[in-house]
C-alpha cells in the first residue's frame, strides 16, 4: 500500500501491483517446503528486489540456524552483518559439491556428467534449496546444482552469490 508503483510476486501468493513496474519484489516465504514439512531445518525465506528485471537485492533467512544473508548490488554480501566471500578453491578435487534433487538431471540425460563431478570433488552433500546456495555465498561450499528453479527461487540468490564474489 505504501508503494503502489511496486509489483509484488510470490510463490505462494501470486502477484499484485502494475505488471510493468520498474521495481518488483519477489518473495518465497518457505523455500524448501519439503524440508520444512518433514522437520528438516534446511529451509529458508527468500526476498529479492528487482529493478528493471535485474535482481539488485537479495535476502536469505535461515530460521533454524539464525542466519540472515543480505546481498546488494555494489555492496557485497553479509551474514548477520559480517562480510562473507565465496571460497577460492583452486582445484575441483578440493571442492565441496552440494545439490538438490538429482532426478531432473537424470531425466535431462546429464547422469554421466553428474556422476563424474561427484567422483572428482572432495565432498558431496545433498544440501537442497536455498541452504546450498547460502553455503556457497558464505564460503562454506564451492558448487551448488539446483536443476529446477523459478524466479522466486533464484532472484534472491543471485545478488547474494555475486556480492560474495561468485
Labelled PLM ranges:
Residues 10-12, 81, 128:
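Short loop/edge segments at beta-strand edges and connector loops
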Residues 19-78:
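DPxDG-like acidic metal-binding loop motif
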Residues 55, 83-85:
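Short, solvent-exposed loop/turn motifs
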Amino acid at each position: 500500500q505504501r508503494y503502489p508503483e511496486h509489483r509484488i510476486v510470490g510463490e505462494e501468493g501470486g502477484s499484485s501491483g502494475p505488471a510493468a513496474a520498474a521495481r518488483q519484489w519477489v518473495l518465497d516465504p518457505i523455500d524448501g517446503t519439503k524440508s520444512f514439512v518433514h522437520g528438516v531445518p534446511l529451509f529458508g525465506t527468500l526476498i529479492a528486489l528487482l529493478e528493471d528485471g535485474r535482481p539488485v537485492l537479495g535476502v536469505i533467512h535461515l530460521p533454524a540456524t539464525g542466519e540472515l544473508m543480505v546481498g546488494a548490488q555494489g555492496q557485497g554480501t553479509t551474514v548477520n552483518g559480517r562480510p562473507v566471500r565465496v571460497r577460492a578453491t583452486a582445484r575441483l578435487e578440493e571442492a565441496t559439491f552440494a545439490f538438490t534433487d538429482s532426478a531432473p538431471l537424470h531425466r535431462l540425460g546429464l547422469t554421466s556428467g553428474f556422476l563424474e563431478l561427484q567422483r572428482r570433488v572432495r565432498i558431496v552433500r545433498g544440501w537442497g534449496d536455498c541452504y546450498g546456495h547460502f553455503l556457497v555465498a558464505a564460503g562454506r561450499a564451492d558448487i551448488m546444482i539446483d536443476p529446477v528453479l523459478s524466479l522466486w527461487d533464484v532472484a534472491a540468490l543471485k545478488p547474494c552469490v555475486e556480492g560474495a564474489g561468485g
